[in-house]
Amino acid sequence: CSSDLFLKAEHPGFEETTYLLLFGELPTKVQLDEFRAMIAERRTLPPNFVRDVIMKAPSSDMMNNISRYILSMYTYDDKADDISIPNVLRQCLNLISQFPMFMVYAYHAYNYRRGEDLYIYAPHPELSAAENILMMLREDRKYTALEAEILDMALVLHMDHGGGNNSTFTTHVVTSSGTDTYSTITAAMASLKGPKHGGANVKVTQMFEDM
């Protein structure tokens, strides 16, 4: 379980746990440094993606926005339908690297649709996934070390694997048909959106607004 993982590995962060789930073991310091550098290098979007995809017809639902971004990446991949393990790993590493931008930009596009100001920041290669999310999320790009640590821990606790919940089970079902990575992950996001799964978080936001 997650608590055992934290006790045994001295609180591995998001990047360490990502490596573990992909390759079956926690990385050494050298492997972790190389992995972080690779993730940072891949944390980019195609030219004009923000203009052509993110800012055009933003949805009132952020998960719908993210699903659209994922599926749009199919268009930019010359080997989108190649489901060999090396290619799927490449695609997944790209998506893992890009998800902080997808999440934050979906939030900003959603707020822009509601008439609020828009600001889009590029990720910083020296920052972790959690730090980049906080930096890109806020207008002043400021955050504390404690905030980054808490978010990093939250990202680890939310990392799903195996297939016990609806969205991870969806990936097993959809990928078994032999479809591409982008369609599979988009299907999982569609499942996550449901009010009996990740969509339940929307009710928490509504509760805060009511308060």
Model-identified regions with their sequence ranges:
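Hydrophobic alpha-helical bundle cores within soluble ligand-binding/oligomerization subdomains
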Residues: 1-211
